[in-house]
From Swiss-Prot:
Gene source species: Xenopus laevis (African clawed frog)
Purpose of the protein: Transcriptional repressor which binds neuron-restrictive silencer element (NRSE) and represses neuronal gene transcription in non-neuronal cells. Plays a role in the early development of the nervous system and is required for proper patterning of the neuroectoderm during gastrulation. This involves the correct speciation of the neuroepithelial domain and adequate development of the non-neural ectoderm.
Name under which the protein is recorded: RE1-silencing transcription factor A
InterPro entries: Zinc_finger/UBP_domain, Znf_C2H2_sf, Znf_C2H2_type
Claim: Zinc-finger is one of the keywords in the record: yes
Origin organism lineage: Eukaryota, Metazoa, Chordata, Craniata, Vertebrata
């Protein structure tokens, strides 16, 4: 390598521009021009030692003039990235570029030329000062040739490391370098001489060969690294200007530091040379040599005590430990940025403070100079970080990265359960819309749309918005005989856009229009045909909808014209004469009441308005979207044309919509006529408004507000969401006067759902709703009748919710016109009813991923009795109302409506009530943020007509009878329904308060059954309340849960209502006060109960498939039920539930931890399947398990939360079976676990008997005890330190710790392994150790404890580099070690034991890492870049060609201690004892002699 680099003739220069083609670069002697492109591209260390050069370079070769002093130059890393990444940037350039020398001229030939110039960067990258210097230099230069005028284009720009300036040509870069260089150091004699012919003849000696263009004015120190120059100036500041300058007598190196000067001199005169036996590496530093050897052996002695990180260098471990401690000692000098290492600070300064940022993100305005950060940023656009950490704000783009983050950063959090499927996508504002727009808009030739088009479109939209508000009354669509008028006018702004833009192609042809009209007429002829309607809506369901609420200006002119033209044609088709007196001013100006019509004809009024704000809505782009858009218009027109004035026609319309896979998912926006402000909430962003109204003469009118392009539709997996905004005095058909149907401030509760019973609806007055339609599978089939409600066929049992601004109202399948609503607060499948169970069993809400099969036909008949009959039994009545009682008068023959209301933050269920001829008193209770309280009073004195609801083939569930003169009161506080069942002819007062978010059910059994009271109320889990009334005694159950109020449950007797006693068989009960932060359990002997789960006190359960989980929870805050009326419950002591049948849901899908209470006090191993409940019934064996063998490896916590893998070969689990109930103790001193890892990530093999235990306890300087077997035979191993025992073995068999007669079978450690740590501790570095089985003297008797143990250690084979064996002083008198060394040919024949009292190895401590790294070779070494981190000088290097001759010779390690030597070096006067060492050392100096002789020959020639 030396000969390749030094003996280089002139040729192509690194800088191949035309300006400096004939410049004599006085310091360019590295011959970089002859390197190939591959060598320039890949980083390559070209480090040569002792290259003695003096004199001048000419075109023929290297000429040297020896003037009494030898000059030495260093060659360092050369590649085209050397200016940014390499530590040894060597760009040689002098400010005196005008010095001409005929012998020092290089003819530059362009290597790779291109016609494209780089003149564009002249005005942006260069300052005015540089441009002036360029012009001056051009005048002083000789004219260049035509070939040199062709500029060369480099693959990567030239980069100035001090300021990160980049240039694409030599001209720019060379002049930029002049700015950073100081004045050239010139001797006093050279300063007097003019820069003319004298300068040509004799160049100053100090400036002949410099290390870089940056030079110090005071001492002449020169370098090419700006940070070295700044460090050099600090020496001047400390010692003053008169500080001594140290210069090298061999080369031009100079410094103000004596330390660095001596360090540099050792590069020329090395004393000790360490050579590698496996490669050609050599170094004069022992620590560098040791680090290089570890690259061959793979040894990593520096291991992190927190995680599994290990390193071969101490500096790397120190840097790694800062990631755990958070220490950031390095600070940026220009700002407050801090980092854990200097490299991060340097990169920060390069990116933020220094130089240009040429890397620009194509997706946004982000700019940077760091390529790694640039790639990470672009990846966020392509692959966003959608995996969010549940603990901190970290986000990852890959699941594995998030798992590694949680394991490394949050190892102490054991209750973290990450479910990636539920992780939400986190995106920036505006990025989602941009990405969606980019996927749909056609990009031709990669052009980007002008923002002017977007601005013009925005102005057009604003004008359209104003016109739509003013002319809303005029745009009413009239549908007569199924035909639509197509005549309308364009607005002025639309005409401007149409005239200014290119006319797009026609989207819909005549044949398409004719088929469109044909489909409308077919629907009119047969509106009840489900198949025809379904087929026509297929494309509507699968249409591609684009979310354009966040799209900014990304639409082409052509597409803009298409959208506008389609919009205009849409207005033409939908405009018609105004036929009614009703009108609306648009979505934002809708009145609270609509003028009622008094005419008795059959008329239909429909109103269409164009989208008011396109910037907030979605745009359908592309031809396919336009086709889908036309089909959506057709569907809406067909739906509008199907509406008649008759009630049957109204049902037909809804039937048509329902049969087209409509699963209505609505959100109500209620405007209540009280002092409360109007609340509105828009779930979707674009809307089709469908308004229905019917007056006293049964006139039905519909106002349809179709937004342009159905812009705000949202497409889910198989569902298409559409919003409908309605205004109605009463949503359903009424025959009575509307003023009698007043339900102001009413807040409906959630529907009581039991199996698939039909539910009636409450009338609503003055409600403004936004209906969110979700198109799903066909679930409903209606049989319409003008006088009776429709027959409802429920398929799928999907619950419906009404969404309020502050609550979600769940509705069951009722009348089709009552808008079955599904809230967005919770997925529909969380509330599905399993209809396959019996009626007596409580309905468990489960979801197994499939639609439940429940097809029940429900018939709703007219009221016939004073009971609400449900399969010949009574059903309870429940209402949720406002703050004041309101009289409700429902229609006798008409279905009732539903009033939306706001209560709480969760969905609310509504119980339908159909009173009779007299008004029913409804008292709504709205307690702030607490669940809504509803009280329904049905008095005996007034006749009450209750509608009968009959379910075919369904068993009876609930029965309610009003008897006597006392009222029957049902009071419910909460968002979930309650069921009360009592016995006939008896007074029953049931007050139930359910916890938030969960249903509470109070049920009773038949007569003459024992009375049992059970109440369970908990968060996030279903609860069941059962009440059984015996005989003729009244029963009262009261459960109160409101905020932090105490809970009390009292079963009342007939004689004394206040005498309460918990009912159960020797089992006291406990009740959790719902709404608080504490969890309690109601544990009563019953057939079925649910164990509540508390999210704050429960044990964290991390469940995987076929894992065994230990569930042991000891409750601290248990309580006893109070027996005094209206007093808080005492929850003070503990109860167990082992005598109950408790089905416990251990599902982890909702990430809820599991809480179990078990009275035995022993761990319970429960195999838990993923997302499947586990039944802890009474039949389960609660005794000692027969087999405790683990299915998976044990989870032994090591190093702050990490788990130790004790599996064998990662396939079979380790056998850690011990005495039942006793854990295995593997802890060490300071609570640190033992490190039992074996080899390269291979687990240890631990074999023990069932009663065996292991104790490895080390405390302070005490003896560690290893206890195994039944007989308790102990080995006492003296430990001088508290450090953990490292039994790591590499490339060796697993360690067998099984015990036979008190002695381990084998304890082998492969070559290069050791006990303890390498850093500042005692090192035992030998080939192999084996405890001999024949050492009978080491057997320890039973039941005896000795403080010391003698070990016989045998060295199986010698180690090539056995240097020292360090043993603590305590072991010198106690450890008897038998050491035997033998040669390679004697290892197999047996060895001879030599008994000694101490180890025959030298005792010494490890030498600390020296900052001086000295001479070392980088060939074959992976640590070449790391060993020079703390050094300014890279040192000397070996020549591979010279070392090849030594490869066959035996390698002899040079000891650190010097002995008498007989061979004296002629260069450095060193003496050597062996001739081999002397020869090796002498050849090191001959490298310089070779170049000196070569230089002398060149001079002679």
């Amino acid at each position: 390598m030396a000969t390749q680099m030094v003996n280089q003739a002139t040729g192509n220069s690194l800088f191949c521009t035309s300006t400096y083609s004939s410049i004599s670069l006085d310091n360019d002697m590295y011959g970089l021009h002859d390197l190939s492109k591959a060598d320039m591209a890949a980083p390559r260390l070209i480090m040569l030692a002792n290259v003695a050069l003096t004199g001048e370079l000419n075109s023929g070769g290297c000429d040297y003039t020896l003037e009494g002093e030898r000059q030495m130059a260093e060659l360092t890393t050369v590649n085209d990235n050397s200016f940014s990444d390499s530590e040894g940037d060597r760009l040689e350039d002098s400010p005196t570029m005008d010095i001409q020398s005929r012998n020092f001229t290089m003819d530059i030939e362009p290597a790779e030329c291109s016609k494209e110039g780089t003149s564009e960067n002249d005005g942006t990258l260069l300052s005015n000062t540089l441009e002036e210097e360029v012009q001056k230099d051009k005048k002083a230069q000789a004219p260049s040739t035509t070939d040199d005028k062709i500029k060369c284009v480099k693959s990567k720009p030239f980069r100035c490391k001090p300021c990160q300036y980049k240039a694409e040509s030599e001209e720019e870069f060379v002049h930029h370098i002049k700015i950073h260089s100081a004045k050239i150091y010139v001797d006093n004699d050279s300063k007097k001489n003019p820069q003319g012919k004298e300068a040509d003849s004799s160049i100053p000696e100090e400036s002949d060969i410099s290390k870089g263009p940056i030079q110090c004015d005071g001492c002449g120190y020169n370098t090419n690294r700006f940070d070295h120059y700044l460090a050099h100036l600090k020496h001047h500041n400390k010692a003053g200007e008169n500080e001594r300058v140290y210069k090298c007598t061999i080369c031009t190196y100079s410094t103000v530091s004596e330390y660095h000067w001596k360090k540099h001199l050792r590069n020329h005169y090395p004393r000790i040379l360490y050579t590698c036996s496996q490669c050609s590496y050599f170094s004069d530093r022992k620590n560098n040599y040791i680090q290089h050897i570890r690259t061959h052996t793979g040894e990593r002695p520096y291991q992190c005590i927190i995680c599994l990180y290990s390193s071969s260098q101490k500096t790397h471990l120190t840097r790694h430990m800062r990631t755990h401690s958070g220490e950031k000692p390095f600070k940026c000098e220009q700002c407050s940025y801090v980092a854990s290492n200097q490299h991060e600070v340097t990169r920060h300064a390069r990116q933020v403070h220094n130089g240009p940022k040429p890397l620009t993100c194509p997706h946004c305005d982000y700019k940077t100079a760091d390529r790694s950060n640039f790639k990470k940023h672009v990846e966020l656009h392509v692959n966003p970080r959608q995996f969010l950490c549940p603990v901190c704000d970290y986000a990852a783009s890959k699941k594995c990265n998030l798992q590694y983050h949680i394991k490394s950063r949050h190892s102490g959090c054991t209750n973290i359960t990450m479910n990636v499927s539920k992780v939400k996508l986190r995106t920036k504002k505006g990025e989602v819309g941009d990405e969606d727009a980019d996927t749909n808009k056609p990009m031709e030739n990669g052009n980007i749309i002008n923002r002017s088009v977007g601005k013009k479109l925005e102005e057009t939209v604003k004008a359209e918005k104003r016109e739509s508000c003013v002319k809303a009354k005029k745009r009413i669509v009239g549908m007569v005989d199924g035909q639509v008028a197509k005549k309308s006018r364009l607005s002025s702004t639309q005409k401007k856009i149409k005239a200014s833009e290119v006319r797009p192609e026609k989207i819909v042809d005549k044949s398409r229009k004719s088929s469109f009209v044909k489909r409308k007429t077919d629907v009119l002829e047969n509106p009840n045909d489900t198949q025809t309607s379904t087929l026509k809506k297929k494309k509507l369901k699968n249409a591609r909808i684009v979310n354009t609420s966040e799209i900014k200006y990304d639409i082409t002119k052509k597409l803009t014209g298409s959208v506008n033209k389609k919009e205009n044609s849409f207005v033409k088709n939908m405009h018609k004469k105004k036929t009614g007196a009703q009108s609306s001013n648009g979505k934002k100006n809708m009145p609270n009441k609509i003028t009622e019509k008094k005419e008795k004809g059959k008329q239909l009024d429909s109103k269409t308005s164009v989208a008011s704000d396109i910037t907030e809505e979605q745009t359908i782009v592309g031809k396919v979207a336009n086709e889908n858009y036309s089909e959506q218009v057709a569907a809406s027109e067909v739906a509008s044309s199907n509406v008649n004035s008759d009630s049957s026609e109204s049902c037909c319309l809804l039937n048509d919509v329902m049969q087209t896979d409509l699963s209505i998912n609505t959100t109500l926006e209620t405007e209540v006529s009280t002092d409360h402000d109007t609340k509105s909430e828009h779930v979707s962003k674009a809307v089709m408004a469908l308004v229905m109204q019917r007056d006293t003469q049964m006139d039905l009118s519909m106002l349809v507000d179709l937004k342009a392009n159905f812009s705000k539709q949202e497409k889910t997996q198989d569902n298409l969401l559409m919003d409908i905004e309605t205004i109605s005095s009463d949503l359903l058909l009424q025959r009575e006067e509307p003023n009698q149907v007043l339900y102001q401030n009413g807040i409906p509760n959630k529907l009581l759902r039991e199996k698939c019973g039909a539910i009636a609806d409450l009338p609503v007055d003055g409600a403004k709703t936004t209906v969110n339609l979700q198109i799903g599978k066909a679930n409903f089939c209606f049989q319409n009748d003008c006088c009776q409600p429709d027959n409802l066929l429920v398929d799928g049992c999907k619950p419906m919710e009404l969404r309020e601004p502050s609550a979600d109202l769940l509705m069951d399948h009722g009348h089709p016109s009552s808008d079955h609503l599904v809230g967005r607060g919770r997925p529909p499948y969380d509330h599905l009813i399993n209809c396959g169970k019996s009626s007596r069993d409580p309905c468990v809400l489960t979801w197994d991923g499939e639609e439940p099969t429940c097809n029940k036909l429900v018939e709703v008949d007219e009221p016939t009795s004073n009971k609400l009959v449900y399969s010949n039994k009574s059903i309870c009545i429940q209402l949720v109302g406002g703050a004041e009682p309101t009289k409700v008068q429902p229609a006798r023959d008409e279905p009732t409506s539903v009033q939306p209301a706001a209560a709480g933050d969760e969905p609310t269920r509504v119980q339908p009530v159909v009173p009779g001829d007299e008004p029913t008193s409804v008292q709504p209770v709205v307690p702030g943020d607490e669940p809504t309280s509803v009280q329904l009073v049905v008095t005996r004195d007034k006749p009450t007509s209750i509608q009968t609801v009959t379910v075919r083939d369904e068993p009876s569930i609930i029965k309610t009878v009003v008897a006597g003169d006392e009222p029957y009161i049902v009071q419910t506080v909460g968002d979930e329904p309650s069921i009360a069942q009592t016995v006939e002819d008896e007074q029953s007062i049931v007050q139930t308060v359910a916890a938030k978010d969960e249903p509470s059910i109070a049920x009773t059994a038949a007569e003459d059954e024992p009375s049992i009271v059970q109440t369970v109320x908990a968060m996030d889990e279903p609860a069941i309340v059962q009440t059984v009334a015996a005989g003729d005694e009244p029963t009262s159950v009261q459960t109160v849960a409101a905020g932090d109020e105490p809970t009390s449950v009292q079963p009342l007797s007939r004689e004394d209502p206040k005498s309460v006693q918990p009912i159960g068989e020797d089992q006291p009960t406990s009740v959790q006060p719902p709404g608080g932060d504490e969890q309690t359990n109601l544990l009563i002997n019953s057939k079925t109960a649910y164990l509540p789960v508390c999210t704050k006190e429960a044990i964290g359960l991390s469940v995987a498939r076929q894992d065994e989980t230990e569930l042991l929870v000891r409750r601290e805050n248990r309580s006893v039920l109070s027996t005094v009326w209206d007093e808080p419950t005492d929850l003070s002591f503990e109860r167990n539930v082992q005598s109950m049948n408790i089905p416990i849901d251990l599902s982890t899908t909702n990430q809820n931890p599991i809480c179990m209470s078990k009275g035995m006090g022993c761990p319970l191993h429960l195999p838990v399947e993923w997302s499947e409940p586990f039944n802890l019934s009474m039949d389960m064996d609660w005794h000692k398990p027969a087999n405790l063998s683990l299915v998976e490896p044990s989870d032994l916590s090591v190093r702050k939360g990490d788990s130790a893998d004790l599996s064998l070969n990662n396939k079979k689990p380790a056998d850690l079976s011990v005495v039942w109930g006793e854990p295995v103790d593997l802890s060490l001193g300071r609570s640190e676990p033992a490190d039992l890892s074996v080899g390269m990530n291979q687990p240890a093999e631990l074999k023990m008997g069932i009663p065996d235990t292991i104790g490895l306890l080390v405390e302070g300087r005490q003896l560690s005890v290893l206890t195994m077997g039944r007989g308790v035979e102990s080995f006492d191993l003296l430990m001088g330190r508290v450090d953990h025992i490292d039994l790591s073995v590499e490339r060796c068999e697993p360690i067998d710790l099984s015990v036979e007669k008190g002695i381990p079978r084998n304890l082998e450690i492969s070559e290069g392994k050791h006990f303890g740590k390498l850093d500042n501790c005692y090192n035992l570095n030998c080939a192999a150790f084996q405890i001999k089985d024949q050492a009978k003297c080491n057997i320890i008797p039973e039941n005896t404890s000795q403080s010391n143990t003698k070990l016989s250690v045998e060295i199986a084979e010698p180690h090539n580099h056995l240097q020292s064996m360090c043993v603590p002083s305590e072991l010198h008198g106690n450890l008897d070690t038998t050491v035997q060394q033998s040669k390679h040919n004697e290892c197999n024949n047996g060895t001879k034991e030599v008994g000694t009292s101490q180890l025959p190895c030298a005792v010494s401590r490890c030498v600390s890492x020296d900052e001086d790294e000295g001479i070392h070779s980088h060939d074959g070494s992976d640590i070449s870049d790391n060993v020079s981190e703390m050094s300014y000088d890279s040192g000397l290097n070996g020549v591979p060609s010279v070392q090849k001759t030594l490869s066959s010779e035996p390698k002899v390690v040079i000891n650190s201690s010097e002995t008498k030597e007989s061979f004296v070096c002629i260069f450095c006067d060193r003496t050597f004892r062996k001739e081999e060492e002397y020869t090796k050392h002498l050849r090191r100096h001959l490298v310089n002699v070779y170049y000196l002789k070569k230089a002398a020959k060149d001079i002679d020639n």
